[in-house]
Design a protein with these regions (language model features):
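Bacterial carbohydrate/catabolite-sensing allosteric modules
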Residues: 1-141
């Protein structure tokens, strides 16, 4: 985004927003964002949010990907079946789960080495798991 000289606009919907209010909040937030300047792409934090953006675009007669590109984040089998055309980043859920279990077991057994930082804290380990782009028809070139 930075290399393209674009400045992202971040729209935040609280995670614990009940489903009936969530979609209305997504719609009003995107409407407000578009009132300031056009939106040409949305990177949703999960595939359900991306589905809500797709519905918002449909109700505003926006073409996806012509007018708006949308990509989600999850790539779960359920969402892939429901929205096979949605571009998404698939998380390696089994690897994440296995690493979480391994860390938990090491903590329970007391075998997890935890470095102490300058503040005397023992921060949790940082693990990175590469996602996989699942291209769909919701992205323009």
């Amino acid at each position: 985004i930075e290399r393209a000289g674009l400045e992202p606009r971040i729209v935040t919907i609280p995670f614990d927003t009940p489903t009936p209010q969530r979609f209305a909040l997504v719609q009003s937030s995107l409407d407000q964002a578009c009132a300031r300047s056009p939106i040409d792409a949305v990177f949703a934090t999960d595939d359900l949010a991306a589905a809500e953006v797709l519905e918002w675009a449909r109700t505003r007669d926006l073409s996806v990907p012509g007018d708006l590109s949308i990509i989600g984040f999850d790539g779960t089998e359920t969402m892939r079946r429901a929205l096979p055309h949605l571009a998404t980043i698939r998380q390696p859920i089994s690897q994440i789960a296995q690493a979480a279990v391994d860390i938990l077991l090491e903590q329970m057994e007391g075998t997890l080495p935890r470095p102490i930082d300058e503040a005397g804290e023992s921060p949790a380990p940082t693990l990175e798991f590469p996602g996989t782009l699942i291209p769909g028809r919701s992205l323009s070139a």
